[in-house]
């Protein structure tokens, strides 16, 4: 086992604080509308330019192992805030730095760290309660746009795209971010349920100009097995032909004579048919077939539940207003499924999301919810260079997470104002069990001014003057660093999602509390490469007699 280096008490805390400050100082320059960029060197390719706090934090690794421990703990704050709310990483880092700096000063002055931590925890709990009271729901498209704009570092076009996407696919819909092909940002919306399976034969195409199959008011046959024998399909085909409507077959596969017969019938115009493979694999395929069945008011023909394809009737078939199929995707628009059943299915999948421990499974389940609940929107990010594309894509993803958080828990005044108002309301009733807890409460409440001070400092203004003016104001009164004006933050469109502000504060206080109560630090001693080399050479002394 390698030898260890141990530091105690003040020696340990000084080293840890140095690491905290290096990381936080690099991250906090990105905060606010006038935050600066940070350039990150990559081992290959062009450097990355970013204003995303968590991206900066992830890159930092310090040479001194004790300092690095401090830096890694603050990195954890940024990562946790990012995982919980998708934004607020810089705010969380600034708060953690402020609480640690104030807390360690108090410890150095002889205060009991455990009582300080209890005081900090009391202050944070009270402020979180006040934040929830200050929060107002984020419902209008304008508010969603404002939240998106702020989170994308005041890029109003991104805010507009996100608001439009949410309007089109609903609050539950899937919105993804992809690389665009031009210089402009674009929004691409797929309404209805889309899955990644195309037509099984190009002979089904009835719109040659777009190379797609379009079926109006089709019946939809859902089969949980391979179809290779046409005899199994004949009763359904005859019934559909009599009804005079097109038919979409979704099965595990359609092959051999069954596929050939369908193609011939389609080309002769006897019955309009298209066949696609069912989406997914294994159990997920069964679940997705069931989703389509509920969406289209059909039944999955499955031998597992004793149903046979030959005995299927028109009542077993689903229906939709329109189906569009290209070589890669199938889109079912306006299925006739019962609204209550669809909502029940969505609730059931949501329950599975809650219980799932795998991120991959959660993502796939979330996609299923979106396909049932609304649709899919793709924001295509345009940029002149690859470096700009990466930076912009990061910002768009941040903005998307922030708007989801705003819809979930509501919004509060931005620009650090909500924390100051919540802190001043909480201060009136907060009382610790002893004087040292009171010190913890006061230092935590004082640290809550730090995001506002940092935003102002990054804008090149005097932080103390602005902080004093904002503290003397009421309600949503604050300072807009972008325009350098005072006023009502919500009226000016400077909003923060409550969840982002709350998560940033809770994670910052949690890690900061652990740091303040640290009394010893242990790390491996660095290996001396010279000694290792000498030891290796020493083993060769007996070679002199070989001549």
Curated annotation (Swiss-Prot):
Its main location: cytoplasm. PROSITE patterns: CHAPERONINS_CPN60 (PS00296). GO terms for biological process: protein refolding. It is found in: Cytoplasm. One of its GO terms (cellular component) is cytoplasm. GO terms for molecular function: ATP binding; ATP-dependent protein folding chaperone; isomerase activity; unfolded protein binding. It is an enzyme of class 5 (isomerase). Its EC number is 5.6.1.7. It holds the Pfam family Cpn60_TCP1. It comes from the Bacteria. Keywords: ATP-binding, Chaperone, Cytoplasm, Isomerase, Nucleotide-binding. Gene3D superfamilies: GroEL, GroEL-like equatorial domain, TCP-1-like chaperonin intermediate domain. It catalyses: ATP + H2O + a folded polypeptide = ADP + phosphate + an unfolded polypeptide. InterPro entries: Chaperonin_Cpn60_CS, Cpn60/GroEL, Cpn60/GroEL/TCP-1, GroEL-like_apical_dom_sf, GROEL-like_equatorial_sf, TCP-1-like_intermed_sf. ATP binds at residues 30-33, 51, 87-91, 415, 496. Together with its co-chaperonin GroES, plays an essential role in assisting protein folding. The GroEL-GroES system forms a nano-cage that allows encapsulation of the non-native substrate proteins and provides a physical environment optimized to promote and accelerate protein folding. Belongs to the chaperonin (HSP60) family. Forms a cylinder of 14 subunits composed of two heptameric rings stacked back-to-back. Interacts with the co-chaperonin GroES. PANTHER family: 60 KDA HEAT SHOCK PROTEIN, MITOCHONDRIAL. This is Chaperonin GroEL.
């Amino acid at each position: 086992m390698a030898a260890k280096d141990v530091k105690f008490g003040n020696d340990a805390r000084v080293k840890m604080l140095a690491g905290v400050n290096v990381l936080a100082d690099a991250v906090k320059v990105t905060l606010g509308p006038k935050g600066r960029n940070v350039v990150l060197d990559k081992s290959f390719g062009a450097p990355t330019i970013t204003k995303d706090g968590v991206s900066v934090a992830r890159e930092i690794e310090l040479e001194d192992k004790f300092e690095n421990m401090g830096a890694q703990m603050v990195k954890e704050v940024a990562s946790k805030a990012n995982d919980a709310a998708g934004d607020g990483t810089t705010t969380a880092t600034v708060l953690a730095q402020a609480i640690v700096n104030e807390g360690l000063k108090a410890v150095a002055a002889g205060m009991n760290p455990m009582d300080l931590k209890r005081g900090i925890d009391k202050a944070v709990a009270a402020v979180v309660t006040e934040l929830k009271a200050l929060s107002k729901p984020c419902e209008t498209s304008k508010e969603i746009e404002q939240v998106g704009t702020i989170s994308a570092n005041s890029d109003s076009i991104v805010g507009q795209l996100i608001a439009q996407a949410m309007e089109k696919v609903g609050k539950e819909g899937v919105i993804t971010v992809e690389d665009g092909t031009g210089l402009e940002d674009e929004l691409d919306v797929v309404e209805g349920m889309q899955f990644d399976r195309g037509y099984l034969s190009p002979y089904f195409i009835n719109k040659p100009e777009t190379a797609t199959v379009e079926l109006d008011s089709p019946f939809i046959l859902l089969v949980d097995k391979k179809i290779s024998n046409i005899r199994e399909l004949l009763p359904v085909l005859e019934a559909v032909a009599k009804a005079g409507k097109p038919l979409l077959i979704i099965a595990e596969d359609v092959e051999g004579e069954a596929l050939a017969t369908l193609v011939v019938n389609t080309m002769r115009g006897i019955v309009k048919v298209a066949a696609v493979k069912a989406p997914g694999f294994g159990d997920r395929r069964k679940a997705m077939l069931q989703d389509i069945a509920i969406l289209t008011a059909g039944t999955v023909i499955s031998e597992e539940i004793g149903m046979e394809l030959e005995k299927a009737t028109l009542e077993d078939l689903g229906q939709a207003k329109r189906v569009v199929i290209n070589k890669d995707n199938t889109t079912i628009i306006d299925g006739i499924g019962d609204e209550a059943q669809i909502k029940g299915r969505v609730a059931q999948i949501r329950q599975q999301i809650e219980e799932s421990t795998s991120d991959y499974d959660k993502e796939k389940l979330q996609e299923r919810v979106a396909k049932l609940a609304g649709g899919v929107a793709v924001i295509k990010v345009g940029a002149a260079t690859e470096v700009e594309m990466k930076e912009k894509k990061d910002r768009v993803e941040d903005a998307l997470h922030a708007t989801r958080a705003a819809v979930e828990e509501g919004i509060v005044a931005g620009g650090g104002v909500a924390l100051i108002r919540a802190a001043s309301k909480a201060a009136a009733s907060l009382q610790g069990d002893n004087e040292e807890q009171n010190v913890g409460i006061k230092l935590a409440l004082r640290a809550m001014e730090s995001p506002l001070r940092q935003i102002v400092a990054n804008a090149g203004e005097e932080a103390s003057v602005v902080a004093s003016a904002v503290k003397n104001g009421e309600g949503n009164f604050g300072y807009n660093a972008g325009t350098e004006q005072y006023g009502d933050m919500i009226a000016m469109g400077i909003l923060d999602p409550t969840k982002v502000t709350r998560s940033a504060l809770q994670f910052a206080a949690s890690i900061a509390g652990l740091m303040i109560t640290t009394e010893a630090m242990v790390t491996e001693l660095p290996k001396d490469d010279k000694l290792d080399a000498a030891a290796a050479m020493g083993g060769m002394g007996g070679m002199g007699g070989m001549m």
